[in-house]
Regions:
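Fe-S-dependent hydro-lyases/dehydratases of central metabolism
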Residues: 1-176
Length: 176
């Protein structure tokens, strides 16, 4: 078959050259490959250590999203790894929470130290007990949410919030 007969334009992408991206802080428009994150953090004086990792809420919180994160958690647990930072997972619905519990994903996430929260806006809109930093203290967090504006996630304008996929968030939580 000849794609040119059916499409105005054919775009070929070499999937071997793609890598996960992370955006932020303070805007979803500031994107970079994960491999550039440390360099950008140093160049911009971002805190290098992640203080919290957050998955779910209304975005990236489906059964499939959490399942992919749970798979990484399961493999990490087999190697004795744990999250180095507080890791919170918010399923997108009560049905999703019940299904991840039924299928063992909840157990996989908890095995690396994750806390699975009730379905709610929660940390995405700053509804969590954030007592690991002082008000006004500069820190970096990573989430799979779709909002990362200043003070959005914890009321602290000095929190630098980065956004990645659930898999990227799990990886960064394991690395700290």
């Amino acid at each position: 078959s000849n794609p040119d007969n059916f499409f105005v334009q054919v775009i070929e992408i070499n999937l071997d050259t793609l890598e996960p991206h992370i955006v932020g802080p303070h805007t979803p428009d500031l994107a970079r490959p994960v491999s550039r994150l440390k360099e950008d953090a140093i160049d911009n004086s971002y805190p290098l250590q992640i203080s919290s990792a957050l998955i779910g809420s209304c975005t990236n919180s489906s059964y499939e999203d959490i399942g992919r994160a749970a798979y990484i958690a399961r493999e990490a647990a087999k190697k004795g790894l744990k999250s180095k930072v507080p890791l919170m997972v918010t399923p997108g619905s009560e049905i999703t929470r019940a299904t991840i519990e039924r299928d063992g994903y909840l157990r996989d996430l908890e095995a690396i130290g994750a806390t699975v929260l009730a379905n709610a806006c929660g940390p995405c809109i700053g509804q969590w007990k954030r007592d690991d930093i002082e008000p006004g203290e500069s820190n970096s967090i990573v989430s799979s949410y779709n909002r990362n504006f200043p003070a959005r996630n914890d009321g602290n304008k000095e929190t630098l919030s980065f956004i990645g996929s659930p898999e990227t968030v799990i990886g960064l939580a394991l690395g700290g």
